[in-house]
């Protein structure tokens, strides 16, 4: 931590050493993301937003707030084709079903990031009514082994997650998995092992697909992150 330059990323125009910062003008918003709130039913180690059953720093978004931005994306032709919902745990937000329904009604693809635990299972009958080819539930599973998954998410989380995952599978939802490269496995080996996990539970997935199994590279807070300058364009 002593070698980290905390003067970085403060000026939108220049880097810490005064160089011109590189940026690309946004031409469209392909995926419009909403954080539904920081509350979550569990508390994971190293959560990027420190979600927990007590953290309500980001209060719940309301349906009317989400509708406002979706309508703006449509009216301004922003090139949006997908609506994403993250948290916290999105299924804890009482308006999430209305948000999903409205997004689908406007012919958007919808991606919901969830731990597939009790908040989702508590509304499963209503969620079932929204099952649609354009809806994808991406389930967070930190490892295919129960012990490693619970090392991050806490005791008694794996079996409940599996109950939700198997419910999605048996009811023919479109779903995907998101995992982490946390234990030193090479990505190819991780995907092979996940395919064994998939076969074991008869899941309708292929771990070789980067859309069906998303892997996240671990970020080290102790490493100084470089800033990108216009000189980097010569590398491309």
Named regions from a protein language model:
Residues 54-68, 88-133, 137, 141-160, ...:
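Canonical radical SAM enzyme core domain
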Residues 142, 146-236:
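Radical SAM enzyme [4Fe-4S]-AdoMet core and its adjacent flexible, acidic
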Residues 30-33, 42, 46-47, 133, ...:
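N-terminal, helix-rich and Lys/Arg-enriched segments in bacterial and organellar proteins
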Residues 31-33, 82-84, 109-111, 134-138, ...:
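Structural preference for beta-strand elements that scaffold enzyme active sites
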Residues 73, 103, 130, 165-168:
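Generic structural signal for hydrophobic
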Residues 2-87, 91-109:
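Conserved alpha-helical substructure of the radical SAM core
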Residues 70-83, 121-136, 187-198, 203-210:
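Accessory recognition modules or surfaces
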């Amino acid at each position: 931590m002593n070698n980290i330059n905390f003067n970085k990323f403060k000026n939108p125009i220049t880097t810490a050493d005064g160089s011109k910062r590189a940026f690309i003008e946004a031409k469209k918003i392909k995926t419009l993301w909403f954080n539904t709130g920081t509350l979550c039913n569990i508390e994971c180690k190293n959560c990027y937003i420190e979600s927990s059953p007590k953290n309500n720093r980001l209060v719940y978004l309301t349906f009317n707030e989400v509708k406002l931005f979706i309508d703006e994306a449509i009216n301004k032709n922003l090139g949006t084709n997908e609506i994403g919902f993250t948290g916290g745990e999105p299924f804890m937000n009482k308006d999430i079903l209305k948000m999903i329904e409205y997004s689908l009604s406007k012919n958007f693809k919808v991606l919901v990031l969830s731990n597939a635990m009790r908040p989702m299972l508590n509304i499963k009958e209503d969620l079932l009514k929204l099952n649609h080819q354009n809806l994808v539930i991406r389930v967070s599973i930190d490892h295919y082994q129960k012990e490693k998954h619970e090392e991050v998410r806490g005791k008694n989380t794996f079996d409940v997650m599996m109950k939700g995952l198997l419910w999605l599978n048996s009811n023919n939802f479109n779903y995907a998995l998101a995992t982490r490269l946390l234990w030193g496995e090479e990505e190819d080996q991780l995907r092979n092992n996940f395919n064994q996990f998939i076969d074991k539970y008869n899941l309708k997935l292929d771990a070789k697909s980067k859309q069906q199994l998303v892997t996240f590279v671990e970020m080290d807070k102790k490493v100084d992150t470089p800033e990108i300058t216009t000189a980097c364009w010569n590398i491309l």
